[in-house]
Amino acid sequence: MKFAEPAASKNGAYLFCYFLGNRPNEERICFAVSKDGYNFTPLNDNRPVIEQKLGTRCCRDPFILRGNDCFYIVATDMKSDDGWESNHGIVTFKSDDLIHWYDECAVDFHSFDSTADADKIWAPQAMYDEKTKKYMVYFSCHNKNSEKPLAIWYTYTADFKTFSKPSELFSSKSGLDVIDADIVKKDGKYHMYYKDECVKTIAHSISDSLCGEYREYENNVVSCTERHVEGNCMYNITGTDTYVMIMDLYVDGGYYMQQTEDMMNFLPVDKKDFSLDFHPRHGSMLHITDDEYYKLIKNFSK
């Protein structure tokens, strides 16, 4: 098998935000950092960095982003011990320095007519929309009284506290379930990578606009492995044309890594060339400055 050559990161560092597992004490937000984008070290001895106080007090699939004047985390508000159809909300946090998190908000999507009977609100992510000057939050959604499959829905917010009425963003032409969407903008195009729940692979669709329409194409599976994967996360190696995708090997355990330069054709990264060996589950990546990197290490090494 041909493997990709790791790219040389030019500046800054990387913050990986993730959770650990299906036990209540593992459904917590953890951090890891890297200087090269391939080899990661957990912070705080791989223990939670945020104490969730609202909602179920358990969260999964955390997504971290740099806002216009602060940082945000959005996550699935869910205690899996309550069942996989028990979740109908998300939880959000805000920070000025990546260390101290506040303004926690639990958002119940049963408060909206369009998701009043939702039994799955999973893996929220967000991207700033220059057209609306708001953040588009997108997530996997299923309404229990609907014959429609799991699909990707979206809502808009300015403050991660109040949200617009959710609507469907993308569903597969196959009519089968899709989850775990991750949208990456490059060269004016929006690339959505998502899990096909039928075959347990990562597929790809493209749009000219953040809020769609996302177009599927033939042979759009991009994951390089036949093992079951989900929780895909894509990020750029700074100063290069290389984009890395990491995926949760949720059946076998561990993580799978692959990379691309054209957003469509990937090569796997050899296991010897990356390190994510602290049992992370579905997470997200944030580019950080050297100053932010060293402050995180200093704070969580106490």
Q: What is each residue range found by the language model?
A:
Residues 1-302:
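Carbohydrate-active catalytic/glycan-binding domains of CAZyme proteins
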